[in-house]
Amino acid sequence: QVVGLKNVMRNELSVEVHGLDDLRHLAGPAVLVANHASHLDTAVLLSTLPAKRRRRTAVGIVGDYFFESWLRSGASAIAFNTFPIEQKGAPTRTAADLLGRGWSVVVFPEGTRSRDGFMRPFQMNAAQLAVQSQVPVIPVGIRGTYAAMPRGSYWPLAGRPRVGIRYGPPILPRPGETPQEFAPTIVAAVKQL
């Protein structure tokens, strides 16, 4: 899976990666929180993660689209190690269970892909997961995927479009901090990238 994914990324896109040092030194599970502009986002994120973390990372995706047909659900589970989440933004028991078993979880808290390439408001799921599970959040900024593979496209545009991904330093909720208090910190960290 990963070899194929990396080959597709290398052949179809020009991907620039920043911020992996903090990620390599982080032990244990984390919630990776990224903006979401294209179906490419998951592939770019997974293909750039260090192998040790990637092997124990699952991706939360909207269940009402990807899990409505057995073909899409099987393909996404095999290619990207996915599990369903609610579009309304509530964290799932599956995500909390994965974190409890030492897995990292990718969350796109906008709830859906951007319609115009700009970041949408974040829902509370990532903050709730981090606070409830007491794990760090790794903010992730992804740029260029909307232009490389806009809505309605099934493959990246020709010409190896440029895409950038930046991993920010891990952030932890403060002791006693609520998800509502922690959420703006996450949003600001992702926007900054």
Regions found by a protein language model. Give the residues of each.
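Non-catalytic C-terminal accessory region of glycerolipid acyltransferases
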Residues: G89-L193
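Short, basic, glycine/proline-bearing loop/turn elements
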Residues: L5-K6, A77-F83, P109-T112
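Helix-to-loop junction immediately C-terminal to a conserved catalytic motif
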Residues: G4-H36
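Short gly/ser/thr-rich secondary-structure transition/capping motifs
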Residues: N11-H18, E86-G89, A148-M149
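Catalytic core of membrane glycerolipid acyltransferases/transacylases, capturing the structured
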Residues: H25-Q87
